Design a protein with these regions (language model features):
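Stable alpha-helical elements in mature extracytoplasmic
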Residues: 15-22, 39, 43-46, 104-107, ...
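Short, solvent-exposed coil/turn elements at secondary-structure transition points
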Residues: 36-40, 130, 150, 231
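Extracellular/periplasmic Venus flytrap/periplasmic-binding protein
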Residues: 1-103
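Generic signature of mature, soluble extracytoplasmic domains
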Residues: 3, 103-106, 112-121, 131-132, ...
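Sec/Tat-exported extracytoplasmic proteins
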Residues: 1-3, 23-27, 54, 100, ...
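Segments of small-molecule ligand-sensing domains
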Residues: 165-177, 184-233
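Structural signal for conserved beta-strand scaffold positions within catalytic alpha/beta enzyme cores
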Residues: 35, 126, 145-148, 227, ...
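Extracellular/periplasmic periplasmic-binding protein-like sensory domains
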Residues: 28-29, 48-76, 91-95, 103, ...
Length: 236
């Protein structure tokens, strides 16, 4: 289903200037920005304002009062239905992109759930989370979509690394792992490496965790889209 009312959210922290620069370069159309506090105590109130939570809560109470003194079957059933709700009314967006990580991301997700944002009507997306399984257990969002490296290769690399060193690697090491492969490819193809220009291949290069392409002096990694579903990472 096509989404037309998107909000891109990110925290006010040390990376704010960098994130805003990247967002500006994307030239996104019809996308609203929402900057929130990195303080969880302030965040909840900000999310309530974003989702018009107080008004939607009042809408529900007013609607319930219309049926409280009625005794006909239809009114009783409607009141029973309303009693199952927390708010009444829609939010003014149908998709969210959250540029955040770790506990800060979980605080945002928890606040959105608390503010009764429908997971059936609003698409939740975020940036690469490196298959952080704690997302499964520390919030009640059923489905979150995000781009990431190849999950199978990522898992195989982690297991191989652990078997060798008895600790799990951080995410940077797997990027270095593919970087070494890229250096070897350039050396084998050209016979030597003299400058960065030796890495500007026309063809795409498939690494352990993804496919890389080279254009305008930049290296771009092609990522897959995954979603969390029933405590699993599913390639979308």
């Amino acid at each position: 289903q096509k989404k037309t009312k998107t909000i891109i959210m990110y925290p006010k922290n040390d990376y704010l200037e960098l994130i805003e620069k990247k967002v500006k370069n994307l030239n996104l159309n019809n996308v609203k920005k929402f900057i929130y506090s990195s303080n969880p105590e302030i965040l909840t109130g900000e999310i309530e304002i974003l989702t018009n939570y107080s008004q939607r809560k009042r809408n529900l109470e007013l609607r319930k009062k219309l049926f409280e003194d009625k005794e006909d079957y239809q009114s009783i059933k409607e009141l029973e239905r309303l009693e199952q709700l927390y708010t009444l009314g829609e939010v003014n967006f149908d998709s969210i992109i959250i540029v955040d990580f770790g506990n800060s991301l979980k605080s945002v997700l928890t606040s959105l759930v608390y503010s009764d944002v429908s997971q059936d009507k609003v698409l939740f997306t975020t940036v690469n989370q490196w298959f952080d399984e704690s997302i499964f257990y520390e919030n009640t969002i059923k489905n979150i979509y995000y781009p990431s490296v190849n999950y199978k290769e990522f898992s195989k690399y982690n297991n191989k690394y652990y078997k060798k060193f008895k600790i799990y690697p951080n995410e940077i090491t797997i990027l270095a792992y593919d970087a070494l492969g890229l250096i070897y490819y350039a050396w084998k193809k050209n016979g030597e490496i003299n400058s960065v220009k030796d890495f500007l291949f026309k063809d795409k290069i498939k690494g352990k965790i993804g496919t890389f392409s080279f254009k305008n002096g930049r290296v771009t990694q092609e990522l897959d889209i995954y979603k969390t579903d029933k405590k699993k990472f599913i390639k979308f």
